[in-house]
From Swiss-Prot:
This is D-inositol 3-phosphate glycosyltransferase. Transmembrane segments: none annotated. It comes from the Bacteria. Coiled coil: none annotated. Mg(2+) binds at Y297, R298, A300, T324. GO terms for molecular function: acetylglucosaminyltransferase activity; D-inositol-3-phosphate glycosyltransferase activity; magnesium ion binding. SUPFAM superfamilies: UDP-Glycosyltransferase/glycogen phosphorylase. It comes from Frankia alni (strain DSM 45986 / CECT 9034 / ACN14a).
Amino acid sequence: MHTSPMEQPGTGDAGGLNVYVVELSRQLAALGVEVEVFTRAVSSKLPTSAELAPGVTVRHVDAGPFEEIHREDLPAWLCAFTADVLRAEAGHEPGYFDVIHSHYWLSGQVALAVARRWGVPFVHTSHTLAKIKNGALAVGDRPEPPGRLLGEQEVIAGSTRLIASTADERGHLIDLYDADPDRVDVVAPGVDLETFRPGDPAQSRARLGLDRDGDLLLFVGRIQPLKAPDLLLHAAAELLRRDPTRRSRLTVAVVGGPSGSGLEQPDALVKLAADLGISDLVRFQPPAPQHELAHWYRAATAVVVPSHSESFGLVALEAQACGTPVVAAAVGGLRTAVADGVSGLLVAGRDPARYADTLDRLLRQPHWRSRLAAGAVGRAAGFGWSATARGVLRSYRHALSPAAVAV
């Protein structure tokens, strides 16, 4: 409800969830499942429906003004969204939909009401959990509101089945939300192995206008406190403090847009780079389509994912699929996405000096980087979207079985 699969990931509220819904829908359609995606219309110019891929239809629901609405204000439009979904179903024969799959707690609220009305099971994927986010808040982040905590609990309790991205998330659902262990399936997200694959770093650097021989540290994602791009800037400044000669060969690229804003260069990060004395090294880029993003990954010496929390971390998978080692926070799903010491390196804590230590070792040892790069490709190879779709389809079948827990 809060974002559309048609939007460009990396800005506003568009991120890994968008990629997940798009790729999962495509792969489910390839398995013979007819998919309809309901999302809120943010413009009066959008068609009522559009084909995302063969077998996948996106339906734009009228709920609220035709503009972006802050997530905290969206609960006021849940009833309108639900009513429009019910109207869409009324145009079909009874029993047209077999199962509902909701993504994020807001959509889960709609699914809960609609599933009861239609008498069909519903499967829910949280993507993020309020209790986990509130336990790992960044400076400048607002805690998730009580309404989300209550709504999320209701969705988790009322779903037919739950899909967790990792065993850790499954544990959180059981321990923090009292989810029935027998109703929670673990299905890892995937990566598009056709788009994100190894290539010639020199060609990618030439395409992007980057120095052929320098070191490139890359951040990809929404510019928000949770993702902590500021930590990368502090770590880069620490690298230069230790070795000023690095300045001539080091570039830090931040590819993404600020969450909830249309600005291409987030003012706070620009100011931080200036305050740290590294403005000349930092390159801000707007969100890039996937085919261009793959060039950024291939061009990078290392991709840095310093998030405070991640349910999985698709950026880490995409980078590894391109053969680039990842330096990531040892939190949440990143501990599953990245094989520490094999495909990348996990850093405990929030100290920029620790990141600088890790990056320093990586930059100084090209042979070690090469081993990690090979390990990265192997790690990502086990996470194709087709495997994700098969796992999700198994969850649907469990939900549809007579023994499924009633909604």
